Amino acid sequence: MRNYSIITAFLYLNSIKGDFILNKTEILQYLTDKQIPFTKYEHEPIFSVEEGDKSNLPNREKVIRNLFLCDAKKKNFYLVSLFVHKNINLKELSEKIPSKRLSFAKQEAMEQMLEVKPGSVTPLAILNNKDKNILMIFDSELQNQTIGMHPMENTATVFLKFEDLYTLLLPHGN
């Protein structure tokens, strides 16, 4: 069995301002307001790893992919972030969490719980999860790295330090 080293951040998060849902413009302003340094690249919409690989986005190897998963009963939801080209074995991950039989959650659940469209899933969307019912899981390889992610829309990528992201998300948990 491959040994996955993961950072599990038990971040059952609220939205920032009650029912206020963050979009691309608002999350960029929020990062600025929180004095989190980031670099933003605008680009054509990227819907898949393959499309991203064909783009001219710099530091592509530092971009993360985000998997919105649920358990077999569709009662527990997880947002898993890892580097874009790292493979993951969902069976092994389910044993580490622990959760029975992980699978990809339905698009409707993603849009309702994270308020993002397909191709735009990002750890930043956890800030939109009003019901605090998503467990955020970060791969430990993200530590001490500058990582790239979509800012709520797949028409841009922002790069920021993992620790800044973690620090940003942590206060919104219980």
Annotate each predicted stretch with a short phrase.
Residues 6-174:
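Extended, low-hydrophobicity, polar/charged segments
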